[in-house]
Amino acid sequence: KFLLKTETTTVLVDCGLFQGYKWLRERNWQTLPLDIDKLDAVLLTHAHLDHSGYIPVLYERGFRGPVFTHHATKALCQILLADSGHIQEEDAKYYSKHKLGKHAHPEPLYDRQTAEASMRLFQSVEFDEQIEVGDIRFYLQPAGHILGAASIIVEAEGKRIGFSGDVGRFDDVLMKPPRPFPELDLLLM
């Protein structure tokens, strides 16, 4: 998650779940250090849950702004986020039934219904389509990682910032290669 703020606009670039070790997963339950009411938009690089999986939590906590992403990423998120919610529900039932863990009544971080509802926020963007959110302009360019994966180029306050997302290989037989970045003031990888 990268938080980008100007004087008038706040966007979050990627909004993923922590995965892997338990101490990392527990961070998903912590409150984000941002005011959701002041968040104008989410810019999403691709569908993998470590980049998109926290969007239903934002939705559940009241975020109703747009989630801008490539149309293929939107289609993949429709499947992945609903499945993530379902798996979390099933895990909570299993932990409860077998009295595992430290909680008397384990709860999922979010459920399938919330994940499906959060999809209403998604707005499809084509590669190279210029989008404005407040005083921030951005566009997506192909990253070659998975279908719809994008790097995001943001222009704000006279600076150009690149967010790589996950970048694929130049010699992949199935994916188009990632596009080289334009001249940037800052690249976040």
Q: Which residues does each PLM region occupy?
A:
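Metal-dependent phosphodiesterase/nuclease catalytic metal-binding core
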Residues: 3-4, 123, 128-189
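Pre-active-site segment of Zn-dependent metallo-hydrolases
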Residues: 6-65, 69-120, 167-179
